[in-house]
Amino acid sequence: MISKITIPVVLLFCFSTSVLAKSTLNIDGNSLYHGYQLYEKGFDYLNVRDEQTAVMYMSFVAGVAGTLSKENIICNESITIGQEADIVGNFLQTHPKERTKYSPSELAMIALGKELACSKNSNS
């Protein structure tokens, strides 16, 4: 009985959350970099809103990295989410002009691809 109610409610919640996110969030390379800067400060020093932004940054990077890994574009089973976040953040920091040139997904793909490409790791 509970599962018959729970599944539609969860699906509705997921759908409504994604629609809301699409309508209210405008993420670009600079806002992605801002998330990295907050992540770098450490969660002990952030207010709730900044903590959410830092978590969003880490989650975004983890999602892109997970997708690239599943498609065998990047390879490194021992890397942590924090290391992936650092790779993308360092790229954003050292390439400020790229932040407005590419989408956040493209920026993360470029950064992770440069450091963790399967072909690069197999030649080492």
What are the language-model segments listed below?
Residues 9-11, 87:
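N-terminal leader/targeting signatures
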Residues 14-18:
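N-terminal signal peptide c-region/cleavage motif recognized by signal peptidases
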Residues 22-86:
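Short N-proximal segments of mature Sec-exported proteins
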Residues 86-123:
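Short, compact, well-ordered microdomains
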